Amino acid sequence: MTLDECVFCNILKGIVPESVVYDDEKVLAFMDIQPVNPGRVLVIPKVHASGLSNLDEETGAHMFKVGMRVAEAVKRSGVKCDGVNLLLSDGRAAFQEIFHVHLHVIPRFEGDSLHISFGRKYGLKPERNELDRIAAKIRDALH
């Protein structure tokens, strides 16, 4: 996908209309045009980054800070909201559909239509040595 084809870049350029919730020098938060629940907001960086590995940590942290503030605002706004999911899908296997990093702020309420499933293996606890082995691999990759 080229930058000209990125819908979020086109929103940032003013080519595609949006309903702004929050705007600063690093991020834009706007209403999702295909909300699973009313009040769903997307927070995007103003610099194109197709995935988290292409986004600087400062901007990523700022996105989550803004997402947290928006989540609290949604709760206070009068929109039906008993809880909030903050969701960021990174990569095709994680169901990322638009390859410009974006954070979903999803209002939740009892009986809404959104279902998050962790699969059949959820609840099966691995052995501690397996958890330790994986933790060591991740810890080593952090350095």
Annotate each PLM feature.
Residues 1-143:
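HIT superfamily nucleotide-processing domains
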